């Protein structure tokens, strides 16, 4: 290589590396614009607490490297600010320095605990493509100025406290792909301008208070794939929905839609999830032009007014996995053609009018729920393919002995045969299952309740109430550590109190009422336990003995309320939501609880032979709603610590041997709407609280020393203390009267005795004999 060639070669190399070094160095030295940096720092200072996750925000570092900040590679302008889940704990100011970032394309402040209103100046960020403000505590109306953000692709304002109507200006967002306004308090109708969003893929308006009709312009949104408006008050849909060729999810549940079943909807082959439950659709179920390529997997039509029979055409949905049409008026048999639905796993037709045989192909599903129908028999099982896990056949017309073919359903987890006419014994084959629920109540089963729970370690619910079972209570239940519901009511079980159940940490409901249980509830050798107990009913048995003062002190679930995720005590079995039910005397009336509230706490020890003092530890059960100790032999005073029972609604202490006064502080219990103190030995004034004055007179009968009942009984039950002397005063007066009477009676005799004694001692006895001797002889004779 010549010298000139070398010279040019080195020049080229030098220039190349100079450009390379400059290009690598310049972003770190000159990338962040000062105005952008200063704007971000001022935005940070608007919040009392602002902690970035990793890279702190300060002037000494490049703002483009700050946590959550992204800049344009060329201009250095901030184009993205992602602070999701950063606790800002304040509101967005109208003049916030955030709005100086005019080149922002992406803004995510979701889950930041923002409150206050959305400032209208947000509409000045005209380059925004994604706006995420969901899961905060924002209030007020959606600002009209958001319609200025014409580059917006994603608008997410869900899970806030926004009010007012959806602004019509949202129709200006013609590029919008995703509109998310769920879980707010929006009202009014959807504006017709929403039909301008021709590119929209997802619309989520669920969990608001929107009403009226879905506008006809809605049919313009032909690219829509997800449509969710459940939990609103919409009343009508456009008549033709067949143009949504890309629709996958259609959820309009829990609204006020009425009219005929929208059959043309099901001609859309892409449709996979349809939920129309909890509306007022009526008439028969019909499907128009079902595509052979239909992708429908989930169809939920529960709680409508649908009638007629199950259509044969439903068997064309070969991809169907879940079918739930419960709580309608569907009648007739289950079509045999439905056996073609080989993908079906969940079949729910509870609370209808189906009848005939239960087809055997249902046993290959995972869940079959046919309660509250009129089925009377079972088709013979020909297939060995049994995958059933949840089987609910309650409230039908089955009769005869326990179906032995159930013993072959090896995968069975939950079995409900309650409220039928089954008889005979409960089979031992049930020990081979690992059941989570066994519900056999209200049949005619007899014999013993077999000890079959040694291997059923997952058992959560056991209900054999309302049968004719006898013998011992099964001790193998001690193995069921997850047991939370036990109901053996109205049988003939004869055993001592199963105090060993107190060691089960999850036990919430224990109902032993109306059996032949006997003996004491408390054994000094055993710990009391029952830390998770919420409801106990052991009434109408033969329990006896004394309860120690601390008997209830370990019942933690009645002391402190732990809010659960659900409103009712329930089981979730493969999609199926199964509520627990029971019967109990509440406010003096036998009640049936089809669902048990999570916050309900009750103790019923009535109609037994328990005696001694009422344990003071009851006063610690601050979550207690119902307390019934009637029909026992409790003595002494009513504990005075009960003013802590501020949630108590029902109190029945009738037919005991209680004495003393009714504690005046009970009159302060504002929720106490029913009480019964009758047939005791109570005395003193009735509390003057409003709740006491609203009670019936019979609630205080046969307590002869109670007073202050004039307003309750509308007559003077016992005179008031102003007109009636106290018992102590009466006793003193009676003693004084007795002394006076004695003095009057014995005074003359004593006087005569003294006189006669003086005569004898004064040697005047001859005179005495002369005057009174014959009378003395007469008296002596008479004495004989």
Swiss-Prot record:
InterPro entries linked: Leu-rich_rpt, Leu-rich_rpt_typical-subtyp, LRR_dom_sf, LRR_N_plant-typ, LRR_R13L4/SHOC2-like, RLP23-like
Annotated localization: Cell membrane
UniProt main location, coarse: membrane
SMART domains xrefs: LRR_SD22, LRR_TYP
GO biological process: meristem maintenance
Ranges per topology, Cytoplasmic: 761-784
Residue ranges annotated as Extracellular topological domain: 26-739
Signal peptide: 1-25
Keywords recorded for this protein, A-Z: Cell membrane, Glycoprotein, Leucine-rich repeat, Membrane, Receptor, Repeat, Signal, Transmembrane, Transmembrane helix
GO cellular component: plasma membrane
Residue positions the entry lists as glycosylated: 58, 89, 95, 124, 154, 172, 183, 220, 233, 289, 329, 423, 434, 455, 574, 628, 644, 676
Family according to the record: Belongs to the RLP family.
Job description of the protein: Involved in the perception of CLV3 and CLV3-like peptides, that act as extracellular signals regulating meristems maintenance.
Protein name, entry field: Receptor-like protein 11
